[in-house]
C-alpha cells in the first residue's frame, strides 16, 4: 500500500507512523499498521490490519483530487468464494468527475484475473529483456526508506 501512495503522490514532506497493538488474544505486537503521509497539497494514509472483521471486503484505494474521485473497492475480491491467494479476483471501480459533490459516479467491474498474474508476467518480461523495469534502484531505495519511516524506524 505504501508503494501505491508513493507512486501516486511522490515524496511526502512528513510521515507520521500510527501503528499499535490491538491487544486481541493477548497480542502485544503491533498488528494494526497505519501511517499518515503529509504533502504540500494534501494528506494520504495507509492502514492495514488482520483483526478487522470484514476488512477484506473493504480493501480499497481511493484517489481524490480537485477534478474527481476514483475508488477501487473492493481492491480485489475472491470471485469464486474461495479464500486462497490464487483464486480469481475482481475489482470494482467507481469514478466521479463532476462539480456535483453528491454524484454517485460510474461503476465498472474488472474481468476475473489472478491476483499475481500481471506482476509475474511483467517480471518475466523484465528478466527476458522484453521490457525495461520501470522501478530504478533509486526509486526502490527511496521507497524502502519511506516504508521504514512509516513503520516508526
Predicted feature descriptions by range:
Residues 1-58, 138-141:
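Rossmann-like dinucleotide-binding domain that binds NAD(P)(H)
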Residues 10-13, 32, 73-77, 122:
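A general secondary-structure boundary signal
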Residues 10-14, 42, 68, 132, ...:
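Generic structural signal for secondary-structure transition and capping sites
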Residues 22, 107-111, 129-133:
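Active-site rim elements
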Residues 25-29, 39-119:
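NAD(P)-dinucleotide binding in Rossmann-like oxidoreductases
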Residues 40, 118-153:
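C-terminal helix-rich "cap/oligomerization" subdomain common to oxidoreductases
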Amino acid at each position: 500500500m505504501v508503494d501505491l501512495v508513493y507512486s501516486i503522490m511522490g515524496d511526502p514532506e512528513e510521515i507520521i507512523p500510527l501503528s499499535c497493538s490491538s491487544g486481541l488474544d493477548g497480542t502485544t505486537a503491533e498488528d494494526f499498521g497505519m501511517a499518515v503521509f503529509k504533502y504540500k497539497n494534501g494528506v494520504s494514509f495507509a492502514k492495514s490490519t488482520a483483526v478487522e472483521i470484514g476488512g477484506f471486503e473493504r480493501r480499497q484505494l481511493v484517489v481524490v483530487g480537485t477534478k474527481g474521485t476514483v475508488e477501487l473497492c473492493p481492491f480485489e475480491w475472491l470471485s469464486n468464494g474461495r479464500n486462497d491467494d490464487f483464486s480469481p479476483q475482481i475489482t470494482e471501480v467507481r469514478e466521479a468527475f463532476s462539480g456535483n459533490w453528491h454524484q454517485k459516479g460510474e461503476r465498472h467491474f474488472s474481468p476475473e484475473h489472478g491476483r499475481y498474474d500481471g506482476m509475474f508476467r511483467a517480471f518475466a518480461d523484465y528478466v527476458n529483456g522484453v521490457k525495461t523495469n520501470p522501478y530504478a534502484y533509486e526509486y526502490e531505495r527511496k521507497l524502502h526508506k519511506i516504508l521504514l519511516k512509516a513503520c516508526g524506524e
